[in-house]
Amino acid sequence: MASDKPRNNDSIGKTLLVVVILCLVCSVVVAGAAVGLKAKQQEQRLLDKQRNILAVAGLLQPRMLAEEVQQAFATRIEPRLLDLQSGEFLKQDPATFDRSQALRDNQMSIALTPAQDIAGIRRRANVVEIYLVRGDGGQINKVILPIYGSGLWSMMYAFVAIDTDGKTVRGITYYDHGETPGLGGEIENPIWRNQWIGKRLFDDQGQPAIRIVKGRAPANDPHAVDGLSGATLTSNGVQNSFNFWLGENGFGPFLKKVREGALKNG
């Protein structure tokens, strides 16, 4: 009996060694898979972003392959960094800018006061990435601005395409939100989105004038868009988002320069 104890101990030791080795191997495999998956997810997020920008620019064709999306984006879309306070472009490479990081940095963003924070976003980065859309001849024919604000249930993220006159909407797409399907979720509805095309964001005095109205918008009103049926709070969120981002704490200074012709010779 006594002679069996060393062999039992050896067996237990070998078993523990095998378990440790298996754990290490599994850890390496899982870590490697996680790194690879994260890279793939980042690549997919970038592709989705490019698709949404091309879509709002009117450049996304049906069933475009990933390579075609990337090529169209590279040839027709020019990302630029914009200083919101001055309304001027920066020379910094947009690829080096991280909005999430900027919002966490007190030097790169500002906390909004309750009076300022009509969109319910709490903080606003000092710098924003926007997108210039170029035609076949290389001339700028649109600018795409990212806007976001609180809806009923979620933060609603959109891209808005604006003419080089700085006031006429050429397209809008809400690409990320958590509003109620069939109600507030109708911000994704192409019929509702198409109503925005041709609407004027500003009045003749340069004041924000776009309005989400309850019910049907008057056909001859260049500033009015139908409200979302059964989704008053989501409609209010859209209105508040535009009020903020068209104002002095958003893209107001930049769009004033655009209305004065800043992009006409781009």
UniProtKB/Swiss-Prot annotation:
Annotated compartments: Cell inner membrane
Any one Gene Ontology molecular-function term assigned to this protein's record: FMN binding
Span of the signal peptide: none
Chain ranges passing through the membrane: 16-36
FMN phosphoryl threonine modifications at: 232
Annotated Pfam families: FMN_bind
Required co-factors: FMN
Keywords: Cell inner membrane, Cell membrane, Flavoprotein, FMN, Ion transport, Membrane, NAD, Phosphoprotein, Sodium, Sodium transport, Translocase, Transmembrane, Transmembrane helix, Transport, Ubiquinone
Mode of membrane association: Single-pass membrane protein
EC number of the protein: 7.2.1.1
SMART domains xref list: FMN_bind (SM00900)
Gene Ontology CC entries for this record: plasma membrane
InterPro entries associated with the record: FMN-bd, NqrC
Xref: HAMAP family: NqrC
Family note: Belongs to the NqrC family.
Quaternary structure (record): Composed of six subunits; NqrA, NqrB, NqrC, NqrD, NqrE and NqrF.
Name the record gives this protein: Na(+)-translocating NADH-quinone reductase subunit C
Organism of this sequence: Yersinia pestis
